[in-house]
Amino acid sequence: MTWSYPVDPYWMVALKALLVVVGLLTAFAFMTLIERRLLARFQVRMGPNRVGPFGLLQPLADAIKSIFKEDIVVAQADRFLFVLAPLISVVFALLAFGLIPFGPPGSFFGYQPWVINLDLGILYLFAVSELAVYGIFLSGWASGSKYSLLGSLRSSASLISYELGLGLALLAPVLLVGSLNLNDIVNWQKEHGWLFLYAFPAFLVYLIASMAEAARTPFDLPEAEQELVGGYHTEYSSIKWALFQMAEYIHFITASALIPTLFLGGWTMPVLEVPYLWMFLKIAFFLFFFIWIRATWFRLRYDQLLRFGWGFLFPLALLWFLVTALVVALDLPRTYLLYLSALSFLVLLGAVLYTPKPARKGGGA
């Protein structure tokens, strides 16, 4: 089935693009505060609460501090690439969010609740996410520091291990819907049910790979403080360092919006059609989920991430892609996928609950 969508005038597209940029920058500022407060609650402490009422002006204080700190360019750095790298990271982080639909057509004051609508939207998102790593790689190369270079090389190598699984996981909804358009994927879910019910393994792979792509714990290897001092941005300070943090948080927010769009119905819900509210709640849930993971999980070693990407994410995504392709090619009932997806969930649940814990070494009390 194909759906048609009205096209907005250019001035409205430009206005919505501006709103997205301003909204993401504001969300970045306050997500730093929210994450610090939540991590503090997980760790039984207070968190930042001194600047302004309830600490709400802490992001402003952080911004002022970052802007007015000394901006150092180390002597051995390639100055042009050193300055260019954080800009590349931020630009490509911002480019993905404009495709995400937040409501049905015409629900934004008579206009469309997205910036642009591309028939090749999934390919566009995949390309933008791939290009974003150039900022990290250039920062490591241009810094002239072995720690920065190792951090950027880690990011480039790990990218290959999880991006293959992520790409194959995206093909499951594409095969079922028959479209690369994000709006088509949301509308299909409105009529047939959420895609994670038909493709739980693909949903799981995409969720994990999204954490790796956003460099969130337990996959924040490119900036492992214990091993690489500060990772690829070791030599950065002031506003340039803040730009890298901005890019990381925007990836974090974008991933939290893409997961419900692709697998959890986007702005749709079986009850109470309040699209913007449901989309906001779904995004907020995954933001909290990622912060929860950061508070409770340890960081994987570099070799563990590569083994996990090649040994679990890629085979699982490939297997589910082949299963979905077989069902679609033979025109079998889609209920087969529902049963297989439920079975895979039960297998995962059983593995989590009944896997024996390794015995402790040593004889300490």
Swiss-Prot record:
Keywords: Cell inner membrane, Cell membrane, Membrane, NAD, Quinone, Translocase, Transmembrane, Transmembrane helix
Transmembrane parts of this sequence: 11-31, 80-100, 120-140, 157-177, 192-212, 252-272, 273-293, 310-330, 336-356
GO molecular function, one term: quinone binding
GO biological process assignments: aerobic respiration
Top-rank lineage group of the source organism: Bacteria
Catalytic activity from the UniProt record: a quinone + NADH + 5 H(+)(in) = a quinol + NAD(+) + 4 H(+)(out)
Keyword Plastid on entry: no
EC number: 7.1.1.-
Compartments reported by the entry: Cell inner membrane
Principal cellular location given in the protein's record: membrane
Membrane topology: Multi-pass membrane protein
Family: Belongs to the complex I subunit 1 family.
Role, per record: NDH-1 shuttles electrons from NADH, via FMN and iron-sulfur (Fe-S) centers, to quinones in the respiratory chain. The immediate electron acceptor for the enzyme in this species is menaquinone. Couples the redox reaction to proton translocation (for every two electrons transferred, four hydrogen ions are translocated across the cytoplasmic membrane), and thus conserves the redox energy in a proton gradient required for the synthesis of ATP.
UniProt name for this protein: NADH-quinone oxidoreductase subunit 8
UniProt source species: Thermus thermophilus (strain ATCC 27634 / DSM 579 / HB8)
Gene name of the record: nqo8
